[in-house]
Amino acid sequence: MNIAVTGGLGSGKSTASRLLAVAMSAEHLDTDQLCRQQMQPGNPGFAAFSQVFGSRFLSADGALNKQLLRQAVFTDSGVKNELERILHPLVREEVAEYYLHCCVTEKNLVVEIPLLFEVGWQHDFAVWVVVYVPEELCYSRVAARDGFTAEEIQRVCATQLPLSEKLKHAHYVIDNSGTFVSTVQQIAWLGKNLRAEISMGNARKTG
Ligand code: ADP
């Protein structure tokens, strides 16, 4: 079974998806991390990006200047769109290939995808889990984790579906507004439920 975990910025996707992978003895993929790997010199994302932008976002050593690119993504929708046009198909293919590997090794796969519904990849997955925390709590956790300003956080959130919309699509919701222990308990329940679904051979309808 392949399971997608999504949510808002800082809602706890990483925390919840890693716990769920442990609960199900599943493999885990983080699509943000796949994007970052694609943008390393020598990889296809970096090559395609360099063809479009030349050395505009490179440091003297030839590596990507992440700070410069991050600023451009915030302020220039042309750069953001082009980056997504390059990276999304590459990452989607990587996830599909890894799922094939999991099918062969008979493992489940948990994939963390911030923009699952926005990019329309939900039908690649059997189960859609949304991790929820109220907006104010997201903001304070992201500010503590990344040092982002409120304005930067708002700009990122403005490009995403509101969490309330994501919740409407969810097969399962994890409420991560409490303690880590509360989240662990919900994940333990979810893992058990999904394992039961698998053993009953449930074919979930994702349409
Ligand atoms: P996302 O992957 O959605 O951006 P993370 O899982 O990285 O979110 O969580 C954002 C921040 O909030 C991290 O610093 C994480 O350690 C913290 N965090 C996550 N869940 C909880 C929780 N239940 N209680 C307190 N802090 C949490």
Tell me what each language-model feature is.
Residues 123-124, 144, 148-207:
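Small-molecule kinase domains that catalyze NTP-dependent phosphoryl transfer to phosphate-bearing small molecules
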Residues 26-39:
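Short beta-strand-centered segment that lines the nucleotide-binding/catalytic pocket of NTP-utilizing
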Residues 14:
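Walker A/P-loop
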Residues 5:
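Hydrophobic anchor at the beta1->P-loop junction of P-loop NTPases
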Residues 94-104, 108-144:
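ATP-dependent NMP and nucleoside kinases share a basic, alpha-helical "lid"
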Residues 11:
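ATP-binding Walker
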Residues 36-107:
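ATP-dependent small-molecule kinase phosphotransfer cores
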